[in-house]
Amino acid sequence: MEPIRVIESRTVVLPRENVDTDQIIPARFLKVTDKKGLGKALFSDWRYAADGAPRPDFVMNRPEAQGCSILVAGDNFGCGSSREHAPWALVDAGVRAVISTRIADIFRNNALKNGLVPVVLDAASHAKLLAAPGASVRVDVEAQTVTLPDGSTARFPLDGFARYCLLNGVDELGFLLAQEADIAAFEGGRR
């Protein structure tokens, strides 16, 4: 995982509420264990017609969405089953942060383990983002703030360990492995 301090990007806005993990990446794409290439399956049933052609009216298929790394989603994003493929698909598609008023706990935990920043904002700040698709936004992980299109900032919660991992580019296992020598010394002293 790469360290994440600040994400600056235009936003792509997906105002649908209760987007579940099966909508993020349908079950038929879950037969792989490699994260690479899953971005093509992101929102597949909404992005592509039955013949596989891109639907030009879907927000992520529009030219202005290209290169955006911040997804502004409706309330209760990532609900449904535990599916680590969902954050894998988002990250593989270039999304670095998801902003909503509520993000499902299991999705949030999976996102953090995979370098995707889950940002929960108050309703008023979120409404400003929903009303300004394509606006430039800054997510500051270190300060735990989002700079909104009007220049104001909104704070978002992030527990200390998750913040540490994002800022240092490590996941939980990487953190534990980095402590291996200290753990061995502690265990050796107990014998």
Curated annotation (Swiss-Prot):
Give the molecular function GO annotations: 3-isopropylmalate dehydratase activity
Q: Which reaction does it catalyse?
A: (2R,3S)-3-isopropylmalate = (2S)-2-isopropylmalate
Keyword Amino-acid biosynthesis appears in the UniProt entry: yes
The pathway that the record names for this protein is:
Amino-acid biosynthesis; L-leucine biosynthesis; L-leucine from 3-methyl-2-oxobutanoate: step 2/4
Q: What SUPFAM superfamilies is this protein classified in?
A: LeuD/IlvD-like (SSF52016)
Single GO BP term: L-leucine biosynthetic process
The family database entries (Pfam families) matched by this protein are listed as:
Aconitase_C
Under the heading InterPro entries, the entry gives:
3-IsopropMal_deHydase_ssu, Aconitase/3IPM_dehydase_swvl, AconitaseA/IPMdHydase_ssu_swvl, IPMI_Swivel, LeuD
Keyword set includes Lyase? yes
Write down the superkingdom of origin.
Bacteria
EC number of the protein? 4.2.1.33
The Gene Ontology CC terms held by the record are: 3-isopropylmalate dehydratase complex
Q: Which residues form a coiled coil?
A: none
Which keywords does this chain's UniProt record carry? Amino-acid biosynthesis, Branched-chain amino acid biosynthesis, Leucine biosynthesis, Lyase
Per its UniProt record, what NCBIfam families does this chain match? leuD, PRK01641.1
Function statement: Catalyzes the isomerization between 2-isopropylmalate and 3-isopropylmalate, via the formation of 2-isopropylmaleate.
Query: Subunit structure of this entry?
Result: Heterodimer of LeuC and LeuD.
The record's comment on protein family reads: Belongs to the LeuD family. LeuD type 1 subfamily.
Q: What is this protein called?
A: 3-isopropylmalate dehydratase small subunit
Q: Which organism is it from?
A: Anaeromyxobacter sp. (strain K)
